């Protein structure tokens, strides 16, 4: 799954215990995420290996709606569509005429898109979180509490209260950088775009 296999302490936090600092960061992140009940944006994505060599560069558009609905469409020539209605995930590759269908893993550490669209009460259960804030930019570092994850470290940044970019680092040092632009929040979204109808002639793989 190319999109998903693929957020430092604030000055005041140094005067707090780790638990207090973490709680402040959880509250701040929840506050920012809760501002967007729906979100649409264009994105550009760059994947690098541990030495910094570029592996892949893609772009596309995304849409999110609480709770747990998301749609990520990667543009051609590496077109791919990832859709979830909150219960089921479809990963469609038109070039291969193939769709993989699976139940949505509700663990935030397995589905980073749920950080933006899922149950905010689960964030503190899944991650150790720190943050710093300066000049309208808020950077969060999220480290999974479980070892059974798709990434070791995730950075999520907001600019002027709007999500700006995300970086995921996996166990071998591979980095996936995602930049969001043209972000629009709290607009009415058609629920149909978070469902998927399998095109005729498409191979279906059920996982």
Curated annotation (Swiss-Prot):
Name the domain of life this protein comes from: Bacteria
According to the UniProt entry, where is the signal peptide? 1-21
A cellular component annotation (GO) from this entry: outer membrane-bounded periplasmic space
Compartments where found: Periplasm
Q: Which UniProt keywords apply?
A: Chaperone, Periplasm, Protein transport, Signal, Transport
Against HAMAP family, the record matches this protein to: LolA
Which NCBIfam families does its entry note? lolA (TIGR00547)
Question: Family per UniProt?
Answer: Belongs to the LolA family.
Please identify the protein, giving its name as recorded: Outer-membrane lipoprotein carrier protein
- Kindly list the organism's lineage: Bacteria, Pseudomonadati, Pseudomonadota, Gammaproteobacteria, Pseudomonadales
């Amino acid at each position: 799954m190319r999109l998903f296999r693929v957020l430092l302490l604030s000055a005041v936090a140094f005067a707090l215990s780790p638990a207090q600092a973490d709680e402040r960061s959880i509250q701040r992140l929840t506050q920012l995420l809760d501002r967007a009940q729906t979100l649409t944006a264009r994105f550009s994505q760059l994947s690098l290996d541990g030495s910094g060599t570029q592996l892949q560069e893609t772009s596309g558009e995304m849409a999110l709606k609480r709770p747990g609905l998301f749609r990520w469409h990667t543009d051609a020539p590496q077109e791919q569509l990832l859709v979830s209605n909150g219960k089921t995930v479809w990963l469609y590759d038109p070039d291969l005429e193939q769709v993989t269908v699976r139940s949505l893993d509700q663990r935030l550490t397995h589905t980073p898109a749920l950080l933006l669209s899922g149950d905010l009460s689960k964030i503190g259960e899944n991650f150790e979180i720190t943050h710093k804030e300066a000049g309208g930019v808020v950077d969060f570092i999220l480290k999974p509490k479980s070892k059974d994850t798709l990434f070791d470290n995730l950075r999520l940044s907001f600019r002027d209260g709007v999500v700006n970019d995300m970086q995921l680092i996996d166990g071998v040092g591979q980095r996936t950088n995602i930049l969001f632009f043209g972000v629009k929040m709290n607009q009415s979204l058609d629920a149909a775009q978070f469902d998927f109808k399998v095109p005729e002639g498409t191979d279906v793989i059920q996982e």
